[in-house]
Amino acid sequence: MKFDLLRTDGGARRGQLHLAHGVVQTPVFMPVGTYGTVKAMSPTEIADIGFEMLLSNTFHLWLRPGLEVIEAHGGLHRFMGWDKPILTDSGGFQVFSLGKLRKITEEGVKFASPTNGDKLFLTPETSMQIQRTLNSDIVMIFDECTPYPATERQAADSMRMSLRWAARSKAAHAGNPNALYGIVQGGMYEALRDESARELIGMDFDGYAIGGLSVGEPKDDMTRILAHTAPQLPADKPRYLMGVGTPSDLVAAVAAGIDQFDCVLPTRNARHGILFTRRGEIRIRNARWKLDTAPIDEECDCYACRHFTRAYVHHLIRAGEILGARLTTLHNLHYYHRLMAEVRAAIDAQRFSEFVARFHATQALGW
């Protein structure tokens, strides 16, 4: 992997990631394809929108369909019909999400499979081997996602466990030509974030992620930890904010120096009839849209906005039609892609602060 930092504008960064399956322009948003598919979309549709990279999930693909199926296809790219870069998360967050169904030890995590109840054991070494089989362009270390809330002692113990697991992940990744990212943890405590970042930088990863945010903490805490942590990460390596977020979150994080994002929000919200637009959200299920013959957003050129009305999409979502979920997902992903394209153009033009002011003013208009 090679990362070129092309230019900066304040804290915002414009770059390129050179990966095994292609070049990715940053800042970049990666749609989430948990089971090897972005829900309701085909790979061709995702590529046609303009996305250059997807995120897929190590934990879920390991459980279903299983590694032997993916290995028989020669890796995840051929299995899912996507020939551009893929980042896979390590499974740490999914194990964290199992709650009482899992037991964390120094060696790894014991848990009952949520699909069939089988007793399973996931370690840093296992996670690296799974991701090697998937042949993901960017591999994430196996870490423990620090819960929220956590005392300083709990956050410290969790973070230091993640550091030990990071070292084991790095050792197990040896020989894999694909990139490996470290993940900064430490809860809501600046000193712990400092320790985590310092130790991970000493291990020399290809890129660095900020984890353990957007896990239920107040927005002010997320903003504080992000603003504190991002500038400490190496300027010549990509910076990835995991699991974030709303359009305003993305714009704020770019200003803080983040290069990569992923989130289920555009696809999950779409299936619930929540649409992102330049003037804020539209909850298309609401009765106010029943007779509205305008497109979702007059300034959007996605397929849904070029061909259908708000009233029609309202009808589809209320009726539970599959086309409704497809159109809303297509629109939301198109919005996110266009937002990041505008962010990159603003940094290129050295007008990012003007873009931010215009973005917030337009979002505040509402419908």
Swiss-Prot record:
It catalyses: 7-aminomethyl-7-carbaguanine + guanosine(34) in tRNA = 7-aminomethyl-7-carbaguanosine(34) in tRNA + guanine. Its cofactor is Zn(2+). GO terms for cellular component: cytosol. It holds the Pfam family TGT. Keywords: Glycosyltransferase, Metal-binding, Queuosine biosynthesis, Transferase, tRNA processing, Zinc. InterPro entries: ArchSynthase1/Queuine_TRR (IPR050076), TGT (IPR004803), TGT-like_sf (IPR036511), tRNA_ribo_trans-like (IPR002616). It comes from the Bacteria. Pathway: tRNA modification; tRNA-queuosine biosynthesis. Residues 243-249, 267-271 are annotated as: RNA binding. The active site is at residues 89, 262. The keyword Cytoplasm does not apply. Substrate binds at residues 89-93, 143, 185, 212. GO terms for molecular function: metal ion binding; tRNA-guanosine(34) queuine transglycosylase activity. Its EC number is 2.4.2.29. Belongs to the queuine tRNA-ribosyltransferase family. Catalyzes the base-exchange of a guanine (G) residue with the queuine precursor 7-aminomethyl-7-deazaguanine (PreQ1) at position 34 (anticodon wobble position) in tRNAs with GU(N) anticodons (tRNA-Asp, -Asn, -His and -Tyr). Catalysis occurs through a double-displacement mechanism. The nucleophile active site attacks the C1' of nucleotide 34 to detach the guanine base from the RNA, forming a covalent enzyme-RNA intermediate. The proton acceptor active site deprotonates the incoming PreQ1, allowing a nucleophilic attack on the C1' of the ribose to form the product. HAMAP family: Q_tRNA_Tgt. Homodimer. Within each dimer, one monomer is responsible for RNA recognition and catalysis, while the other monomer binds to the replacement base PreQ1. This is Queuine tRNA-ribosyltransferase. The gene is tgt.
